[in-house]
Structures are given as C-alpha cells and as structure tokens.
Amino acid sequence: MAGADPPLPAQLLTQSTVPVIVGPTGIGKSQVAFELARRLGGEIVVADSRQVYERLDIATNKPSAEQRGEVRYHMIDFVDPATTFNAAQYVEGARSAIDDIIDRGKVPIVEGGTMLYVDALCDGFTLTGIPPDPALRAQLERLDATRLRERLLAQDADPGVDLHNPVRMIRAIEILEAAGPPLRRLRTRTPPPWTPVRMGLVASLEVIDRRLAERSRRQVERGLIAETQAALDSGVPENAPVLTGIGYAEAVAHIRGELILEELPHAMARSNRRYARRQLRWWRRDARIRWFEIEPDPLPGILNYLE
C-alpha cells in the first residue's frame, strides 16, 4: 500500500466533507488512514477511547513513531491514564481539531473503532445512540433504589428521569458514564458543520480472526506485560478505564498470577474477536457506510470513491 505518490488535490475541503474510516478492530484502519492522509495531504483525527491515554501504546495500537513523523495525528496521547475521559470531552476536542485542520487548508481524516466516539462526532449525541454497558449494568443492578438515586444525582443534579424507577436510573447512569453530564444535552442532537463521508473496511471473519491472533502475539512480544507493569507501578489503578480494556485486562490478570503466559495472547485474541463482531453488528446497521474489502488493497477504491 505504501508508495511515493504525490498528494492529490484537496477537493474535499471545498465540499465541506470529511472522510471517516471505520471497521472492526485489527482490520487495518490505521494503515489505510495513514496512506490516505499521505495521498490527500491530510491529518488524522483518531476516534479511539484508549489511544487518548498517555504512555500506554502497545495494546492501544497507536501509530508508530515513523507514521507520526510523516503525518500529523490528533486526539492521542494527551490524557493521564489514571483519570477518566468521556465521549463529550472527545467530541469537543475532535471537532476543534477538525476545524483547525480545515482552517489550515488540510484534509481532516477521522479514523477509529470506538463506536460511540465516531457516531457522536459525526451525528451529534443521542440517548439511543449510546450502546449498553453489560458490566456496568450488572454492577448497578445490585444497588437498591436509594443508592441508585444518590449515584445518579451525584453525576447530574437534574437528570430528568423518574427517580423512583430503577430501570430508568440505571440507563441514565449508563449514559452519563459514557457521555458525561448533563443528560439534557443529549436530548437535542447537534451535528457538525461538515459532512462525514463514511467508509468501512471489512474482510471475512476468518481473515479478521487471523489478523487478531497475529496482532495479539506481536503485542506480547513487543513488551505488553512490561508496559502494563510500568503503568501499575506509576500509580495507574487496575480498574482505570485503559487497564480494563482488551490486552491490558489480560496482562493484569497475568501479572496477578491468574493467567499463564502461554494463554495470554489467546485470551486477548478471544476478547478481540468478540469486540470485532460487536463492532460489525453496530456499523452494518448504518446504510450510509460504503464498505471496502481490506484485501488486497482498499486504497484505490477509496480514492476513486472520494473523487
């Protein structure tokens, strides 16, 4: 896919459109976005809930130093991993970055796999657009109505939901955890001033699973355990959002003695396979996405589609 082709004219700017590349984890979105940015003279706005965190690079699949030296990236490496970061903060930062890129005469290219981030950035927030969080729901369902009410009101003093209905309160907390307060903001969709051109990368499940297995093995070989241990030693708690994500969660289990080294990459691959299928189900419902096969090379078709 790499080459020395000269940048293409930036016709996209005059049309107020922004290329958006989505797809399941491990499909190769980052490389395609990098090549597209080289051809269009663009900059990449990453839509990944874990790449925002500093220092943790391996299981978050951040772009390489060589890629960052050639193409400018936004929305990565700026949040302390011991803290939390929500979708509302992401949208604010990403929209600001896109405006700045356009103002400087460049082409912004959105690339990422975090479903909520992409949808909120391109469409504006909606209550129904925030997917369920089964783990959080299981935790909240153990609380009585009084404790649910206390937790909800601590996050949003005026949530606008029935404070005697546990089901409504659980859903409200779930949304607030993902998007941030206040809930009333999410009842009015605010789309961006530009038009997203949605493109998805796809392959057979066999190809996706093979890529995920290979990536998991490489991540362990690159030093995933040492990177995870360094984060823990620096004070990042085990339950920090970035360390509960795929790759780091399994590495933490290994460090605790709960998962043997030989099983580590297989456990990571299994978690990634489940996540990839969830991503595919989510995006296949969106008829606005134009799909491109990742093999042998989607870039020519993408360039032709954009022109």
Give, region by region, the residue ranges found by the protein language model.
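Phosphate/pyrophosphate-binding catalytic cores of soluble transferases and nucleic-acid-acting enzymes
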Residues: 1-307
